[in-house]
């Protein structure tokens, strides 16, 4: 996941964690240098981390986590969602949990707030979710659902 023009965040599950590398070109030669690496952070599996400003959000072995990207410091970790999927929609994280639940959590580096939790699908849900306007589409191997998250301001 691109952080800025020179830095990239790499995340991996199975105990690997994450790292930030800086990529640059000097004298016609490309180089990649590791800035930091943290095994216990952002161990994503079946999903990717999301970068928003100077932080990343992601499911670390199923628990939602926020990590500051300059130093690789965990800012918070809370909520169990299994190996689901996460999207950043405006200022909110839309999460499809592994168990088929839909959650909306504020994308706030200081403190997350759960705005909604709703059981939607039954069974293991690993598929990516999609957002079209205020409509959220979720599916797994057995079923598909659409949830309207219309708000007072007509957007998430």
Question: Where do the PLM segments sit?
Answer:
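Noncatalytic, solvent-exposed loop/strand surfaces
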Residues: 1-156
């Amino acid at each position: 996941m691109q952080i800025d023009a020179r830095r990239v965040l790499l995340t991996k599950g199975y105990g690997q964690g994450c790292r930030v590398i800086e990529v640059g070109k000097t004298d016609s030669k490309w180089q990649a240098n590791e800035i930091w690496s943290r095994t216990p952070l952002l161990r994503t599996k079946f999903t990717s981390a999301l970068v928003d400003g100077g932080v990343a959000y992601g499911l670390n072995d199923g628990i939602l986590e926020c990590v500051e990207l300059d130093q690789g410091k965990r800012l918070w970790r809370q909520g169990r969602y299994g190996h689901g999927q996460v999207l950043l929609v405006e200022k909110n994280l839309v999460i499809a949990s592994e168990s088929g639940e839909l959650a909306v959590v504020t994308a706030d580096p200081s403190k997350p707030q759960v705005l909604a939790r709703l059981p939607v699908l039954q069974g293991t849900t690993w598929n990516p979710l999609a957002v079209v306007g205020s409509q959220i589409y979720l599916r797994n191997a057995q079923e598909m659902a659409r949830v309207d998250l219309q708000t007072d301001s007509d957007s998430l």
